[in-house]
Curated annotation (Swiss-Prot):
Transports uridine diphosphate galactose (UDP-galactose) from the cytosol into the Golgi apparatus. It functions as an antiporter that exchanges UDP-galactose for UMP. It is also able to exchange UDP-galactose for AMP and CMP, and to transport UDP-N-acetylgalactosamine (UDP-GalNAc) and other nucleotide sugars. As a provider of UDP-galactose to galactosyltransferases present in the Golgi apparatus, it is necessary for globotriaosylceramide/globoside (Gb3Cer) synthesis from lactosylceramide. One of its GO terms (biological process) is UDP-galactose transmembrane transport. It comes from the Eukaryota. This is UDP-galactose translocator. It catalyses: UMP(out) + UDP-alpha-D-galactose(in) = UMP(in) + UDP-alpha-D-galactose(out); UDP-N-acetyl-alpha-D-galactosamine(in) + UMP(out) = UDP-N-acetyl-alpha-D-galactosamine(out) + UMP(in); UMP(out) + UDP-alpha-D-glucose(in) = UMP(in) + UDP-alpha-D-glucose(out); UMP(out) + UDP-N-acetyl-alpha-D-glucosamine(in) = UMP(in) + UDP-N-acetyl-alpha-D-glucosamine(out). Belongs to the nucleotide-sugar transporter family. SLC35A subfamily. Interacts with SLC35A3; the interaction is reduced in the presence of SLC35A4. Found in a complex with SLC35A3 and SLC35A4. GO terms for molecular function: antiporter activity; UDP-galactose transmembrane transporter activity. Keywords: Antiport, Golgi apparatus, Membrane, Sugar transport, Transmembrane, Transmembrane helix, Transport. The chain crosses the membrane at residues 3-23, 37-57, 65-85, 97-117, 140-160, 169-189, 200-220, 238-258, 269-289, 315-335. It is a multi-pass membrane protein. It comes from Mus musculus (Mouse). The lineage of its organism: Eukaryota, Metazoa, Chordata, Craniata, Vertebrata. Residues 1-24, 356-390 are annotated as: Disordered.
Length: 390
């Protein structure tokens, strides 16, 4: 969802979804506030709906579709969408678009080949998510999948030499504890379990997906920082590689079955909904996060966990016990704490230590950091790029 929400496309879109421009200071704050609330709603629905729709489609009675074909179709649709967006950027001039793609994809082939690595990982991640969601309850997957924040943070420290605040390290520990509690509840659950589900395989798939998501997101960020290509061009290149690699994976894993039963075997409206969500969800988030800050994205993740849990109870008969509630609560709190901007943390710590006071700036000293015109404090630079809320 990778889409890279949950998959490659989401992560890829998120990697390039850097807030670009703020509203003018004199513009109406009410309109911007509405956009932020709309952004929150879109992020919550996209995060929860992809997981729930995959779970629903994979547990429906009848012929089960091939997950590898869904991954390929999502990559094809994502690539076509990015191609149309680039076509619109060239004002509908086919010649200009062809010349641009020839220069960006073929002439600068080194930059193009660099995207083969994250594309391979995103394709693998998308397939792993189908395995995980097919073997775990949607709510359990949603909570456990937040380990991607931990892996992304660790890869950012190792590959980008980023530093984390003490609060962020503490929130990562809290996150790991919450996920461990949820998995302990899953392993010790006494309720009925479908015979075709393997929680151990589901957990292994989630962990592998989180590791791949963290590495690919940070690697993709490094590529974006070292080049001038637009996010739509990079997603088109990812889509080209993703389609090719997805077809190789399809042939390797399910080639004989697909050849005998057909590429679209088992496709229903629910399956097409999953494919469309995977293809367009990440691109939609890339546009939405222009109006979202880290706190909003962390809040969206927390709400999507709650929404997934409630929907799982209604749709799939998920049993909510105190142990799961405790673990999920720790994860929600950890996500929120991790997304807090450092400026806000320092301000809270300073206020609690010294109490309310009026601070006067000494002469000759630079002014303290101010709220931006968007109303947000300075945020962690890598979080909007590498951690995509799903």
């Amino acid at each position: 969802m990778a889409a890279v929400g949950v998959g490659g496309s989401t992560a890829a879109a998120g990697a390039g979804a850097v807030s670009s421009g703020a509203l003018e200071p004199g513009s109406t704050t009410a309109a911007h506030r509405r956009l932020k609330y709309i952004s929150l709603a879109v992020l919550v629905v996209q995060n929860a709906s992809l997981i729930l729709s995959i779970r629903y489609a994979r547990t429906l009675p009848g012929d089960r579709f091939f997950a590898t074909t869904a991954v390929v179709m999502a990559e094809v649709l994502k690539g076509l969408t990015c191609l149309l967006l680039l076509f619109a950027q060239k004002r509908g001039n086919v010649k200009h678009l062809v010349l641009f793609l020839h220069e960006a994809v073929l002439v600068q082939y080194v930059d193009t080949l660099k995207l083969a690595v994250p594309s391979l990982i995103y394709t693998l991640q998308n397939n792993l998510q189908y395995v995980a969601i097919s073997n775990l309850p949607a709510a359990t997957f949603q909570v456990t999948y937040q380990l991607k924040i931990l892996t992304t943070a660790l890869f950012s420290v190792l590959m980008l030499n980023r530093s984390l605040s003490r609060l962020q390290w503490a929130s990562l520990l809290l996150l790991f504890t919450g996920v461990a509690i949820v998995q302990a509840q899953q392993a010790g659950g006494s309720g009925p379990r479908p015979l075709d589900q393997n929680p151990g395989a589901g957990l292994a798939a989630v962990v592998a997906s989180c590791l791949s998501s963290g590495f690919a997101g940070v690697y993709f960020e490094k590529i974006l920082k070292g080049s001038s290509g637009s996010v739509w061009l990079r997603n088109l290149q990812l889509g080209l590689f993703g389609t090719a690699l997805g077809l190789v994976g399809l042939w390797w894993a399910e080639g004989t079955a697909v050849a005998s039963q057909g590429f679209f075997f088992g496709y229903t409206p629910a399956v097409w909904g999953v494919v469309l969500n995977q293809a367009f969800g990440g691109l939609l988030v890339a546009v939405v996060v222009k109006y979202a800050d880290n706190i909003l994205k962390g809040f969206a993740t927390s709400l999507s966990i709650v929404l997934s849990t409630v929907a799982s109870i209604r749709l799939f008969g998920f049993h909510l016990d105190p142990l799961f509630a405790l673990g999920a609560g720790l994860v929600i709190g950890a996500v929120y704490l991790y997304s807090l901007p450092r400026g806000a943390v320092k301000a809270i710590a300073s206020a609690s230590a010294s109490g309310p006071c009026i601070h006067q700036q000494p002469p000759g000293q630079p002014p303290p950091p101010q709220l931006s015109s968007r109303g947000d404090l300075t945020t962690e630079p890598f979080l909007p790029k590498s951690v995509l809320v799903k």
